[in-house]
């Protein structure tokens, strides 16, 4: 049998997968379930995205892209941030990935040294502590409060360091 890396023993089994499996089981039994587990949207892919994907495939855009995303997509994201969120980010400041967890994990792997402490504001997504551990870091959970809209305040951050 193949022996797994010692780093795998540092993490727990996925609570997301466990909850998703339970939600699917209960749904299959006819129960009315709203699953907040796997982060899957409860709507289909918007028509304009479907059409853009089909157009890209027909244009032969089926090869690997730049590691941080296609320049035209990064530019579109930059424009979206400006028009919809009143945020100014240059395309060079944007990195596109397959999902939020993947981007966060890449950042952790690129920046953590063994036993670096990573502050995780609570509430948090269940995977974050294990992602930190897998990257060699040590998670430190810092509680946030509803009266602060669950945002980590500067004083809370200072007190946790």
Predicted region positions:
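Conserved core of the PLP fold type I
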Residues: 61-161
């Amino acid at each position: 049998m193949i022996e797994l890396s010692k780093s795998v023993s540092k993490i727990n089994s996925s609570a997301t997968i466990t909850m998703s499996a339970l939600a699917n089981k209960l749904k299959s039994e006819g129960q009315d379930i709203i699953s907040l587990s796997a982060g899957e949207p409860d709507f289909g892919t918007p028509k304009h995205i479907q059409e853009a994907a089909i157009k890209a495939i027909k244009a032969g855009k089926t090869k690997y892209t730049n590691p941080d995303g296609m320049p035209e997509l990064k530019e579109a994201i930059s424009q979206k941030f400006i028009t919809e969120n009143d945020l100014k980010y240059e395309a060079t400041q944007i990195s596109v990935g397959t999902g939020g967890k993947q981007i966060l994990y890449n950042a952790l792997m690129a920046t953590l040294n063994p036993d670096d402490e990573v502050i995780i504001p609570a509430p948090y997504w269940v995977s974050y502590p294990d992602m930190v551990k897998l990257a060699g870091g040590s998670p430190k959970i810092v509680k946030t409060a509803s009266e602060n809209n669950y945002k980590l305040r500067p004083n809370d951050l200072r007190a946790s360091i």
